[in-house]
């Protein structure tokens, strides 16, 4: 009986953390760039994102996606906008107000750069 209870509890906790990770799905406005984007799961079940205006894929999930319950964040993704010279390695924090905060680094020949973006859910 005790084993069944433990298994049931583990299953419920897994479902709750999965639901939290899926909080990134939907249509968002990137405040800093003024772009409307959609984050979705592709046919392979991986997270991806596209710019609504031209369907440019700007966000791709890296191989080993991890969800940190304590920080309420998903890591790692590759982010690249058409106007950028290089891509960014980023993670996504799900904020308490439901918005998303993206932070990451990009490496070039001359140094390392940091980016921060704020996404607001669109209805």
Feature roles, as predicted:
Residues 4-16:
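Sec-dependent N-terminal signal peptides
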Residues 14, 49, 104-106:
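Small side chains
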Residues 16-27, 116-123:
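N-terminal helix-cap/turn-to-beta initiation motif at the start of protein domains
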Residues 23-89:
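Central antiparallel beta-sheet cores of small beta-barrel/beta-sandwich binding domains
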Residues 52, 105-107, 122:
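Predominantly extracellular/luminal cell-surface or secreted proteins
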Residues 53, 94-96, 123:
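Non-catalytic surface loops within mature trypsin-like serine protease
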Residues 81, 91-118:
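Short, exposed beta-strand-loop hairpins at the edges of beta-sheets
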């Amino acid at each position: 009986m005790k084993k069944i209870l433990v298994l049931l509890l583990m299953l419920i906790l897994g479902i709750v953390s999965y639901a939290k990770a899926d909080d990134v799905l939907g249509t968002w406005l990137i405040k800093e760039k003024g772009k409307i984007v959609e984050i979705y799961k592709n046919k392979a079940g991986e997270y991806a994102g596209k710019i609504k205006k031209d369907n440019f894929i700007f966000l791709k999930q890296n191989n080993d996606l991890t969800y940190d319950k304590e920080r309420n964040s998903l890591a790692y993704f590759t982010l690249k906008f058409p106007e950028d010279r290089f891509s960014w390695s980023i993670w996504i924090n799900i904020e308490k107000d439901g918005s998303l905060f993206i932070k990451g680094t990009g490496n070039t020949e001359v140094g390392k750069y940091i980016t921060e973006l704020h996404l607001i859910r669109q209805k």
